[in-house]
């Protein structure tokens, strides 16, 4: 699956808590992540637009055309990098957006308020993102009063898989890229390049570990140990949450949590998903769950597409 866009060195530098350390002459970013690289982050307009609209106006029919509001399954895309808030300026990527946990939570909350919305489909195309952001979405899904289906399309990896694991069921294509359960915190060191270019790093710091991870200084074994400690803690929490969400033995999840991903067919065999299929499979699942006919299940237009019209 290395030819998939999400898999183009997804694990190089990724997105979790962005720690920005700045002085008048120094800016650097260190990133911890459950998956997707910063270079891969492309997403949608934030949902500020709908705050002045009624909840009903978020969910229009996608299958029948027009703005008639008779659809009963909300469709929420989770694409690109998952972060807590959308803040392109702080990421230094003006004009690009992420999948914001705050936005996803808001839309799920709105869907819960609308009586005619009987279920929620998460349409996942994501290599992952921030641990906390992924956890926030997952917890919201677990607490949802309406049934939730996660449909993994091209990819549902790492933090995005954590999100999917909280749904009532997970459906994926036989060719979907699934899993990649693990945590990464990597960066490109500039030390040798700086020496080659005649640049000297001047460290002014109070606090022994304040500059740990600065790419312009060498990383000691002791400092590496600090990072590995944190990675191991986050990894253990991720494995535990997925184990609980999927109702699978933690040892079974741990064996699968080596950072690798797998196609949907193997994910089904390993218990990471529940069924192979696409949107029509989702339709059939909701029809059975809600005691309706298949033709009575109508998917709403994805909420970001609605926002694009405003």
Q: Where do the protein language model's features map onto the residues?
A:
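N-terminal organellar transit peptides
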Residues: 1-159, 169-173, 185-310
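Active-site loop architecture of trypsin-fold serine endopeptidases
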Residues: 175-183
């Amino acid at each position: 699956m290395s030819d998939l866009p999400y898999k183009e060195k997804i694990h190089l530098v990724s997105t979790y808590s962005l720690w920005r350390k700045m002085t008048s002459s120094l800016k650097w970013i260190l990133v911890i992540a459950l998956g997707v690289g910063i270079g891969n982050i492309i997403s949608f307009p934030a949902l500020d637009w709908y705050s002045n609209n009624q909840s009903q106006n978020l969910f229009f029919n996608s299958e029948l055309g027009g703005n008639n509001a008779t659809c009963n399954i909300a469709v929420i895309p989770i694409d690109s990098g998952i972060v807590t808030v959308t803040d392109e300026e702080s990421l230094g990527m003006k004009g690009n957006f992420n999948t914001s946990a705050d936005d996803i939570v808001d839309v799920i909350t709105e869907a819960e308020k609308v009586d005619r919305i009987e279920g929620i489909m998460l349409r996942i195309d994501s290599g992952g993102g921030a641990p906390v952001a992924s956890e926030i979405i997952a917890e919201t899904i677990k607490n949802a009063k309406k049934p939730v289906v996660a449909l993994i399309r091209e990819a549902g990896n790492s933090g995005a898989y954590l999100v999917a694991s909280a749904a009532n069921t997970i459906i994926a294509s036989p060719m979907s890229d699934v899993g990649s359960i693990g945590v990464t915190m990597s960066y490109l060191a500039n030390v040798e390049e700086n020496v080659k270019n005649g640049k000297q790093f001047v460290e002014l710091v109070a606090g022994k570990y304040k500059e740990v991870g600065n790419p312009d200084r060498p990383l000691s074994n002791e400092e590496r140990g600090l990072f590995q400690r944190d990675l191991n803690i986050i990894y253990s929490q991720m494995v535990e949450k997925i184990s609980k969400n999927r109702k699978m033995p933690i040892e079974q999840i741990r064996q699968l949590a080596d950072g690798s991903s797998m196609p949907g067919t193997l994910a089904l065999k390993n218990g990471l998903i529940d069924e192979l299929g696409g949107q029509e499979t989702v339709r059939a699942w909701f029809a059975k769950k809600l005691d309706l006919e298949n033709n009575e299940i109508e998917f709403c237009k994805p909420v970001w597409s609605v926002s694009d019209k405003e």
